[in-house]
């Protein structure tokens, strides 16, 4: 066939009637604009003039947008589509002619190239911000508009109309070119880049100038927005380097919490104004949210409608293609009367055209769907950020009475932050479904009715009737989940108790008892999990079975009720429609549940936002104060001297005025004055009454009184935390005549530092807790830490003052926490300091030091006003002004001299109390609490350092390995799936269930394929042979049997997967618990408690509830994809050729996504905890924050944490969209390839329909394969962590002797022989005891002493084989303990530890958890421990409740309970490991007395905390550095004046 532009007919070149009357010349004329544009733009694009001429340097590869940016892109895409149609029409029309006519499609091809070039050219101009180059585009659109208009006019003259496709295409071209021309004119009008004297200069957005902003979705062009192309760099880079917070940067300004907070707050305030005149109405949060975020939701809904409507293109195109193939197969194609031009109807009846349209429809549908998802997710994140800011702002204004009186608990606030805001965010995600789903369902039913008639309604009815069952199942799932959560909380509580008391449990051989208790709770939890698994299985079953049931009902009804045969086109289009219909009906139950939860969340949020607030704080700025003159007169005090050397011995009779300050008495001013004050905690009843007090400026005011008299309330009333019923709090104006000091010049007169009675710490470093936002001053910081005696404690911390403390950091004692809070108040450069009972948790040494160095020296020398609440009356001699409180009123106010003169009775009462305190002081001087605190901290640090050392060694090994690895190896490790861990998890569920799951899954999907294949054969048979009734019955029967089998297998597979997951969870937890409980004590010393507990909480929860559904979804989507590929390949083997490149593309997409997704999920998780903790710690320290006036700083911190969490979540969502767009486009390519291969190669219309149906299915499941794969990889991390603990070596519980060989009453005498004993904690550690030899007689009382770290406690552990005895032996009553089973050995000895441990339960359970003793024996033990009367007075007696840790008893009582516990065992050997270290002297005396009488005939080994406690011992062992250096009686040891024991005795005197 001859090739020429106008064809090889000479008449085609005839121009006798005019050039414009020749269609070939008109088509040639249309080439001119395209050639012009290519000629102009290609040199610019290749030379790169645009980018070199950039006037603005932008660090991102992004740009500003010219006016009409999005419209231009939309019009350009529309134009490209019309060009494709023009090319297709030209090729089809040309195929109908005898010779080739290039003019029919060549201009369209050039137009397609030119239009593509125009958008690339425009993109580069925007990148360079050089709009003058747009003039070329303007000329192009003008020329294209003119030439297309000429062509349209010619067609009109030729008699063509809209029924002709060519006419329609040309008309569309004219409209689109005209609109694009209008866009260019608008750019000229706005930017004035040409034809105007003053061009409009526009800079790129502010966000793009910020190097920290990496989230570029709002700034990229429309194509990049739709495909998330800008994410490529981040996702690819994740292979080389893990994604961190620096990589994702900051949020754009429009998405930051503060921006959205302002929008929501303004909308909410507007609602409050509307209801201000209606007391019974509350402002609507719903309307406020709609006003603030309604527009993006409407945009998302529009995208969703478009996507849903385009979704119906699939069934319609399948119907058309199968019908065309069927006509070709039957030879019924009508080819007569073909004209040279195509009509629109003929064009749309072409199978290839339908295939391309299906491809484009899928591309558009998925693009709109992902755009809808993204907009709702972004809006939901913005809403959450705004709500968090609103809640936080409200917390900072919350009335103190709301929290203190229980009207608003910390748990409720945490729920608002962690749960309610997320509920509203998720509701917003699902919101467009509420109005999109009904339209989708109605459209689907209408199309089904058009295809199958009334029989379609039967299938729709099946779906509608079964949908409520899904809602019922969802409700039951929620109930089961709540029940599971309750049991899980109980199990974790018990596990936590075990881990905290593991040392005691091992020493008493009670591990199995407590392990059994946890296992019982676990069985209840598993029972609840079984219910959860059952309903989950039913939900999965319904999802899979309902489409099958609907199809079965429809086709059987159609076969018998309709006289027409079922055609392939109808069958497979109907199947596709049923799949579309089922999705919204199932989703409906989820949306309804979230809607109900959202309504409840809004109610809770509204109640919180309308709760009481504290009053205005203008009092802090002096606005409410009286004139200075009216509160200026104040009775001064004479100076007094301070003895900084003496410890805290103060006597009122020797009181003298100090010489600290020299100020005129009559001119001493008042800092704070309260007049006629009545204050309440919100109940309406006055807690403080008739308060008239004055706080002198620059002096020390002490507030004293009995417990509960209102001292702390008075401080809080002054700070504005209480409700003022009557009276005023006045803060004096600034005295301008007052001398200015350098130290006070920068101070705010009304700034306050405050240390609360209950210490409150930030989750931050020690330094940050002390400086509290103030600039760091090294000299001042050192002075403060020295004054508060903090330096020795700081030195014990692993990272010094850079160690993180608080809830998420190192656990400190009460005294250490108290001193840090006082140091915070001292460090602040404020004029006024409030200290609320700062000595309560401190021993006498620290109290004296803090009083002398911190208060009297540091604060008073700095001329600061100090208000001190205290019970330590011995410090009253230092007070400049004293306020005595009683029953919420001021009893007396004045100097100590005033009170001594005017209220002798009160003064004498104070003297009596001081004498009593002095007596207690004598005892406390010996019981050095601080030493104990530091010892405890040192032990904790030792454990952590040991663990850190092990981790550092592991890291060093890994680093050495990494040095040897090249980049490809690192990338391989980052992308490798943890298949070994997966295998361990699957085998944990049992091989039988694993094989059953695999077999049932394969069988189920085989049956589903068989159902569809049977349908293809059935419909193809009818279309070819028009088979009669007998064959119809055969096909219906076969179809019914297969559908029934498919429904049954759906149930079996869902149950099998859930059951296997449940079994795996059960086995993994059981193995973990037993491994941990039987682990060596060294493991618990070197592994943080939180780390172990995390295995039982978060990791177990993932294994229990997250892995099974992920595994089910992954296997289902993978098998569906494989079935689809197999069926398409069977129907059209040519498809296999295209499968390789598509498979390679899919491999790389999932490979890159999994790595990036894992990093982003970890970032999302890691940034969420600090945010929740910040809310929690703010609510706990609200009074302190407000006193310091640091609300703004804390708000800023909250906004930073919110934005950090939001940016991580936003990037994770964008990564998911990136994946789904690519897998959806890949699925569309599969559909296009399968369609073309089916049309050109298949002769069976049924198989063509089947192949296309599966091709459409694959689009839905490709992204689920990758998403589930990524989720499973993250979740398998939990299994890996659990398995890492399962490899730990357990203690050797077996002995060479059988338990039956051990005498029943062993040890009976209590004789102990220690032969050359060498002990170490682990094989790779140095010995802690070296060659110890000793002999202890039966019934002897032995004392063991030595300095810290000498090996005393190690010897006590050696008796119980808690440490490694690698040489020597211990023989008790003739039996070597190394031969005994561990349980037997430990159950026959008794020990009392330093830390008294009680477990939650009853007193009976704590004394005798094995339930072996009678009540009489228990009462006897309590009587011996002098607890009988106290226990009898409790409700329940022996069955009285013991709270967790025994917190409802004092420390002394707890230690006495431990003594009773030891007596219950009736062991002949008792070991006391510093048992009196943490109790007062009185309790110690009781303990010593009881031991001497109750254990008079037993061997008692006492490890001494104080040497005085073993002075009555019959034998003393003295250790130094693990060596027994002295062993003799006390008199003999004291006779050696230079001996270690004598030295210890002298030191402790």
UniProtKB/Swiss-Prot annotation:
Cytoplasmic compartment residues: 52-72, 123-132, 189-301, 372-423, 477-531, 593-990, 1056-1127, 1267-1549
CDD domains, per database record: ABC_6TM_SUR1_D1_like, ABC_6TM_SUR1_D2_like, ABCC_SUR1_N, ABCC_SUR2
GO molecular function, one term: ATPase-coupled transmembrane transporter activity
Binding residues annotated for ATP 2, in chain numbering: 1346-1353
Membrane topology designation: Multi-pass membrane protein
Domain ABC transmembrane type-1: from-to ranges: 297-597, 994-1274
Glycosylation-annotated residues: 9, 326, 330, 333-334
Keywords for the protein's UniProt record, in alphabetical order: ATP-binding, Atrial fibrillation, Cardiomyopathy, Disease variant, Glycoprotein, Intellectual disability, Membrane, Nucleotide-binding, Receptor, Repeat, Transmembrane, Transmembrane helix, Transport
Entry-linked InterPro entries: AAA+_ATPase, ABC1_TM_dom, ABC1_TM_sf, ABC_transporter-like_ATP-bd, ABC_transporter-like_CS, ABC_transporter_C-like, ABCC8/9, ABCC9
GO cellular component terms listed in the entry, alphabetical order: inward rectifying potassium channel; membrane; mitochondrion; plasma membrane; potassium ion-transporting ATPase complex; sarcolemma; sarcomere
Role according to the record: Subunit of ATP-sensitive potassium channels (KATP). Can form cardiac and smooth muscle-type KATP channels with KCNJ11. KCNJ11 forms the channel pore while ABCC9 is required for activation and regulation. Can form a sulfonylurea-sensitive but ATP-insensitive potassium channel with KCNJ8.
Protein name: ATP-binding cassette sub-family C member 9
Organism the protein comes from: Homo sapiens
